[in-house]
């Protein structure tokens, strides 16, 4: 499965370094408007990009900003979102299996989102 990366932010990142981290393609939305993390600005721009690019899977970092932004984007795209994943797998049908602790960390839930993009 090909891996792509979307960088959203001001022009202060080493784009070549992003490509060295395993992404086959690096997409960029560069603007000084993104210098301050503001959920609604990021949300609107990222939803537009995701609708156009049509990725099967979208993953977010478990940062404070990622935890605030991801559910807004999932709601805007009318898809599911699984938070706090500890592992991922791709099943025989090519769907993302999202693994996360459940029931006070006594078991691990294996979750699949039924529509694209699958988000975690």
Where are these predicted regions, by residue range?
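N-terminal glycine-rich FAD/FM-binding segment characteristic of electron-transfer flavoproteins
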Residues: 1-120
């Amino acid at each position: 499965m090909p891996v792509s990366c979307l960088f959203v932010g001001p022009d202060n990142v080493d784009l070549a370094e992003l490509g060295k981290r395993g992404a086959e393609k690096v997409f960029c939305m560069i603007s000084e408007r993104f210098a301050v993390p503001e959920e609604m600005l990021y949300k609107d721009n990222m939803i537009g990009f995701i609708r156009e690019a049509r990725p099967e899977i979208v993953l977010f970092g478990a940062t404070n900003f990622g935890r605030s932004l991801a559910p807004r984007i999932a709601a805007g795209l009318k898809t599911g979102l699984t938070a706090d994943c500890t592992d991922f797998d791709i099943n025989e049908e090519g769907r993302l299996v999202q693994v996360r602790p459940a029931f006070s960390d006594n078991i691990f839930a294996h979750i699949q989102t039924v529509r694209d993009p699958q988000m975690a």
